Amino acid sequence: MVRMFLQLVGCLMHRKMQPKLVLTPLHYITKNQRQWVAKPLEQDVITAFKARCQQYGFKSEAILPHDSYLINLGNPETEKLEKSRAAFIDEMQRCNQLGLTLLNFHPGSHLKKINESDCLRLIAESINMAHQEVPEVVAVIENTAGQGSNVGWRFEHLAEIIDQIEDKSRVGVCIDTCHTFAAGYDLRSEAATEVTFSEFDQVVGMSFLRGMHLNDSKGKLGSHLDRHHSLGEGEIGWDCFRYLMQASGFDNIPLVLETINPDIWQQEIMMLRSFVASE
């Protein structure tokens, strides 16, 4: 009945949000990610979506929608920037209509036409504009692998954007483990993962962490290769994910599985849950 209801990748909620892990976080899209324009949400769709969420126990803080891949909030070309901003505001409005409070997005690219700081400033301006147009929804910046001219791969990039946001209660970060590793932050052991997130805390602040994407990496450390792998089968290994499931700093945020093989999602989720049980 509701075609756009769930774009479920396979995910889990960290233990203190729901002790029995019944509540599952959701990776979700509000429209086709490869189109600029979609028809407005109809009221019956909105009503049905909210009813389904209530029926299955999905709370807004456990749903992490992702915006269109076409959007570039740091685009140096005025016409394309305006198009991206309009699309981003539309995504926020859709979230607000559906009762969702988070919107995950890739920050943008300078396209080798402006410097990084100017690109980061445009992204911050774009977020501020969206906040003025749409209430309540939090803009959740996803870190990147640093491929091409993408910004957001250094923790300093994320901090520079956040520093320029007027309402800091409505901005956050989603850390993708594959992107983090590909960007040069080591996650290959529990000790290395602790060091990396200590640096994140110092540069950005753990209080801004609003969600995570859990992926192993096909690329090596610092490769800038955005190629997800199944947990434990890539260059990162299991120790990182054991640490994330057991460390208290990651309580109460959605942890979304974005790995490549749907046939083993259930096994991956069971393994992650076993780390909590064995704590």
Swiss-Prot record:
Its EC number is 3.1.21.2. Keywords: DNA damage, DNA repair, Endonuclease, Hydrolase, Metal-binding, Nuclease, Zinc. Zn(2+) 3 binds at H179, D226, H228. Pfam families: AP_endonuc_2. It catalyses: Endonucleolytic cleavage to 5'-phosphooligonucleotide end-products. One of its GO terms (molecular function) is phosphoric diester hydrolase activity. One of its GO terms (biological process) is base-excision repair. SMART domains: AP2Ec. Disulfide bonds: none annotated. It comes from the Bacteria. Belongs to the AP endonuclease 2 family. This is Probable endonuclease 4. It comes from Photobacterium profundum (strain SS9). The gene is nfo.
